[in-house]
């Protein structure tokens, strides 16, 4: 699963020598080289009998914690020219934004945000898409595609300007269609993406002390958010 690969590739820099980092690089090439003609990416690949797009896992893969983390920590950006056009097609042709510039939730082949219950898919989608744009912008700058970088930056500004007003209910981030308990995963992603203003951190800390829905996969981001918050409180 590429969601797991995203978490594992960052761990590899702490436990494996540089030869081990090549595993993630190979995975990146495989994922993008098997991109479907319409632009969708999916995993596991290659596969003869089961290959499905889990939209949020794919956003995680191409984004800040996935492809960008691999490039930054290995200091090897050699894969970027090979995957950039496919990444751009996925983020801007497969994915769509609404009139306010916010990403539209997609079902893909399997609409999956995490194990368990109380998954706020809309907030998670917005955060993962924002982080994917953040990575894409860095790659555009690396390739000196300044027009692309400026366009991506404008998209990020629009999302950042709308996020708090759309999802903050006075106590936590929730989408209007989410009927379950407040999703700790969504709060975590709001923090680590940078979309949650620092002024919300104290309230979010209360949410993290109450809500425990994340699986080990998403708990990584809950823990990271807690570290970021506790640097201030």
In which residue ranges do the predicted regions lie?
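Active-site core of glycosidic bond-cleaving carbohydrate-active enzymes
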Residues: 2-232
């Amino acid at each position: 699963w590429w969601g797991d690969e995203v978490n594992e590739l960052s761990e590899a820099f702490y436990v494996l020598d540089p030869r081990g980092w090549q595993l993630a690089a190979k995975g990146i090439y495989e994922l993008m080289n098997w991109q479907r003609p319409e632009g969708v990416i999916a995993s596991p690949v290659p596969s003869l009998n089961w290959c499905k797009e889990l939209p949020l896992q794919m956003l995680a893969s191409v984004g800040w914690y996935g492809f960008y983390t691999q490039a930054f920590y290995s200091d090897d950006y050699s894969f970027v020219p090979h995957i950039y056009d496919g990444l751009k097609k996925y983020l801007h042709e497969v994915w769509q934004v609404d009139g306010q510039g916010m990403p539209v939730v997609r079902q893909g082949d399997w609409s999956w945000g995490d194990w368990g219950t109380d998954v706020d898919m809309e907030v998670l989608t917005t955060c993962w898409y924002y982080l994917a744009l953040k990575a894409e912008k860095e790659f555009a700058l690396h390739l000196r595609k300044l027009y692309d970088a400026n366009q991506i930056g404008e998209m990020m500004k629009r999302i950042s300007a709308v996020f708090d007003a759309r999802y903050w209910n006075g106590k936590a981030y929730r989408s209007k269609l989410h009927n379950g308990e407040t999703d700790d995963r969504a709060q975590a992603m709001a923090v680590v993406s940078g979309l949650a203003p620092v002024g919300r951190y104290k309230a979010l800390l209360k949410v993290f002390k109450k809500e425990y829905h994340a699986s080990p996969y998403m708990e990584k981001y809950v823990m990271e958010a807690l570290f970021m918050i506790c640097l201030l409180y």
